[in-house]
Amino acid sequence: MQTKGLILFDIDGVIRDVTNSYRLSVQKTVLKYCNWEPSTYDIDVLKNEGIWNNDWDLTLELIKRFINKNKLSLEPPSRDNIIKNFEKLYFGCHPNESHMKWSGFINNEKLLVDTKFFDFLNLNKIRWGFVSGAELPSAKFILENRLRLNNPPLIAMNDAPDKPNPEGFLKLANKLLEKDFGPNCPPVAYVGDTIADIQTIINAKELYPSQRFISIGVIPPHLKTAENFQKQSQYESKLKAAGADLIIKSVIDLKNIHKELFKA
């Protein structure tokens, strides 16, 4: 089968809604250690700096900044303690336990796409895969158990350096296309909801300027409410300013623009 192009997807905020799971784990972990619960806007502000792709590091940074801003005589927790508390909230137990035992916030996650979407991509000769900073058990659970995808191509946490380092993205793209990057290689798109995702593609373009890479920003679910309309518009502007080639409201929108996306 001749490949028209390749689309790699982030998972959190793109494939699943993590408003009441990962983001809630961030909020409740910060609350535990400094008696302040950040809003989703506070989290977005930090993520928009483009370097806080790891939610554990983001959580610790929120705590440190709050302590410093308010001149509190508190000692920030260790990163290990952040991780332990975070995973207790998110999984409800150790992540290596059977997912049947998971009782945490992960059970709150809603899918933003269905299996038929990937059947559509296959039918249209578009290859696909996932590059995410999520832990492997969590990523595999959403892709294999919830979406019922068979052995989906995946780069997860610890498989490669954190975004915006493009190593994981380039590694999976090269593996799936089985070609050297360049003008004769099919276009490669990446769909993500943060500035770090956009910056990942900018960094990839710098390494392989003759390869066509496309950065696609998607609006995260927590902003898709009437009361957040202005914030949604501001967020979209930030993604564009960061260098996004295209902004979409939902991954499903790709079904309507896939032909234009990979047009020579």
Question: Model regions: which residues?
Answer:
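Non-catalytic pre-domain segments flanking phosphatase-related domains
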Residues: 1-9, 61, 68-84, 88, ...
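Active-site neighborhood of HAD-like aspartate-dependent phosphohydrolases
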Residues: 1-45, 51, 57
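Short, acidic loop-to-helix structural element flanking the phosphoryl-transfer center
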Residues: 3, 8, 91-130, 134-144
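Helix-loop "lid/cap" segments that line or gate small-molecule binding pockets
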Residues: 27-33, 56-72, 172
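Short, surface-exposed acidic
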Residues: 34-48, 68-86, 93-94, 149-152, ...
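Structural recognition of alpha->loop->beta junctions
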Residues: 125, 147-158, 226-258
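Substrate-recognition "cap/lid" segment bordering the active-site pocket of phosphatases
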Residues: 129, 134-189, 194-213
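Acidic, Mg2+-coordinating phosphoryl-transfer loop and its flanking beta/alpha structural elements
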Residues: 190-249
